[in-house]
């Protein structure tokens, strides 16, 4: 049992270390330290889809403030790029750890504990567009494939990802599969192509509903791009044979500028957020234009090591029935 546990841990470390090295080199970012707590009231917390309640923390020696365990570092990263004067084309990546206790379900792919490569880059002049989003997605996908090939060479786990990733807009997808639910559409398109970047998540589709929820103040999901489609963000999905379904590895996007922020908070009824310090800074032009996202560490390890449950590659909390159903839960 001990030998198996140690081998399991070595595999996890190999995937994480290999991916980190490739990501820093190919995406041209520097690794930095990030926070676990966010001060309530400054607008820095990531509200995700807007329904998740963060973990509140009171600090004894800071009695006049309340803090929350971060959901992600989407806003903190952009603030940090501005604070330290990062130039166009430069960026950072954080080994981010977070808690999301309001996950709808604790299952094979969802955990209370979240670990991500949380990255952000300053967009070069004139590149706040769909072409640059796709270029960045292709870079990250290349990192995933290089890591998969390294795992194949070391552990004899056959590489399965296609050489190229397929791009499709959510509007195209609903037209292609009008009778399917969003999750069923993801499964159908990802099974067909193996690896897909689904563009435009957060805005309303022809039926008036979004493909999935997104907060209004980090990704730009409303800007018109091509052929009447909207959104400069999306999810990177791969086909997972272990689960028989599409599997999200990353969510990313070009971030809101002043106009997109005002437009999106009005659409979601969140205009009150514009009173926060972070949002005021953005509206006053104090932040650079950026692109960023999160890449799930445990999900990446789970996929590349062909595990059936995320609890096999991370230590979290699970209902007893989950522990009873899987022998290798950590």
Swiss-Prot record:
UniProt-listed Gene3D superfamilies: Bira Bifunctional Protein, Domain 2
Keywords for this protein: Amino-acid biosynthesis, Asparagine biosynthesis, ATP-binding, Cytoplasm, Ligase, Nucleotide-binding
InterPro entries for this protein: aa-tRNA-synth_II, aa-tRNA-synth_II/BPL/LPL, AsnA
EC code(s) of this entry: 6.3.1.1
Entry's Gene Ontology BP terms: L-asparagine biosynthetic process
Pathway the protein contributes to: Amino-acid biosynthesis; L-asparagine biosynthesis; L-asparagine from L-aspartate (ammonia route): step 1/1
Catalytic activity: L-aspartate + NH4(+) + ATP = L-asparagine + AMP + diphosphate + H(+)
PROSITE patterns linked to this entry: AA_TRNA_LIGASE_II
Transmembrane segments: none
Gene Ontology, cellular component aspect: cytosol
One term of GO molecular function: ATP binding
Record keyword Ligase present: yes
UniProt-listed HAMAP family: AsnA
PANTHER family registered for this protein in UniProt: ASPARTATE--AMMONIA LIGASE
The name this protein goes by in its record: Aspartate--ammonia ligase
